[in-house]
Amino acid sequence: MKIINIKIIRNNINNFSLPQHITPGSAGLDLLACIEKPVSILPKETRLIPTGIAIYIEDIEVAGIILPRSGLGHYYGIVLGNTIGLIDSDYQGEIMISLWNRGSNKFILYPGKRIAQLLFISILRVKLSLVKSFDPFMKTIRGVKGFGHSM
């Protein structure tokens, strides 16, 4: 198991807790809204919400991914404003979550509410090699067919 350093930036809510796996099978660690009072998110509005924590991954072959919580999106229309968040190994600032209300009703976010998931992934570091063309013996069935190629 890899150890990731975490620091509490602000602890301004009752029952503040560090990110945790809610069940033994949970892939992501739940991130909480570290806010002092409820925040309204109007339809089509985005709000930047603090989590109260910072992490230092340190290992350049690991990154953090911020993912939405499925229930918030499905039931309330609350999704991540940037669709996915990437935390580089050398970032040490507070983790902030951009929430977007894509729904048609006002959403009230309460202090301590679980708002996103943090997942750690391995990163394959590559070196790009510039070529003028690809080897003709390495042609694939797909080739250059892009979006919708298999429809």
UniProtKB/Swiss-Prot annotation:
Which reaction is recorded as catalysed by this protein?
A: dUTP + H2O = dUMP + diphosphate + H(+)
What GO molecular-function term can you cite, just one? dUTP diphosphatase activity
Pfam families named among the record's database cross-references: dUTPase
Identify the CDD domains for this entry.
Answer: trimeric_dUTPase (cd07557)
Q: What is its EC number?
A: 3.6.1.23
Report the cofactors: Mg(2+)
For binding substrate, which residues are annotated in this chain's numbering? 69-71, 82, 86-88, 96
**NCBIfam families, sorted:** dut, PRK00601.1
Name of this protein:
Deoxyuridine 5'-triphosphate nucleotidohydrolase
**Species of the source:** Blochmanniella floridana
